[in-house]
Amino acid sequence: MFKNLKIIKLENRALLKIKGEDSKEFLQALVTNNINFISNEKSIYSALLSPQGKYLYDFFIFQDSKSNYLIIDCEKNSYQELIQKLNIYKLRSNVEINLLDRIDVYTVYGSDLIKFISNLKMTYQEGYTKNISDNLFFIDPRNKSLGLRVYSNNLSNEFKEIASGILSDWHYLRIKNNIPHPYIDLEKEKSFIIENNFEKINAIDFNKGCYIGQENTARQKYRGTAKRKLVTAEIIGKDVTNGEKIVFDNRAVGTIRSSSKDICLVSIRSEVYDKCKRDNIKIKINESELKFL
């Protein structure tokens, strides 16, 4: 029925259960997005920063529809660090943080996605959330083009009939839409999220009030102090490698981030990007050229 639809089981995810009467207030004071946006019909994407406003962790946050406790969907290889960091800030708050197991995470994407979403009687908008037969679904809050996230310990037959996808194809879709994968495209304790499209992917609420790193993040937005942009470029020639330096006018101006097939993400100085776009300039890197899209 849905030939142009793929499903991938995301093996690199971990789920944390946040419960206790202070859990919402606790997270609201820490993370970049607004916890009060979360409901049984709305999930969010957010980040935890250092006091200097630099990237530490990113995650999805949603609500268990039965008990109303919060669930954080984060990278599996850093969940223990994240728990430790959250516990440091917990102090006397009535909050419990535990690993939630026996639930698998999937992403569903493809050109038939809108029809499939309609079949589930869901609204095709970022963060829209629905619980169906004890399975939780939400449209990716970063960009609806990234697909449907599914949380289940027993997929229904309609999902089992979807063909398996390839993670590299999903990354191509991500890069095409200029969306960072933080553990590839950002450097922990070094990168600023304003310079890496976190506002564009709905991870920051500038009206919520204070959170860790808020002052520097707000300054970069309102005073225009951000120096770099994360942009998508076409690769003309041979493949490029994550971490390769970009030189323009005899000075280092940027770095290659994630790539897939003939496109990549590039962290580059804003004035260089603006000049290249304005004057239709390609940047040479080894045996290739980059054309900003």
Question: Where are the regions that the model predicts?
Answer:
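Acidic, low-complexity central loop/insert segments
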Residues: 6-8, 14-17, 60-177, 248, ...
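Short, surface-exposed ligand-recognition loops at beta-strand->loop->(often short) alpha-helix junctions
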Residues: 17-23, 108-112, 234-241
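Hydrophobic side chains in well-ordered alpha-helices
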Residues: 26-27, 82-85, 229
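Glycine-centered loop/turn motifs
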Residues: 41-42, 120-130, 239-244, 278-280
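Anionic-ligand-binding alpha/beta catalytic cores of soluble enzymes and soluble regulatory domains
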Residues: 143-230
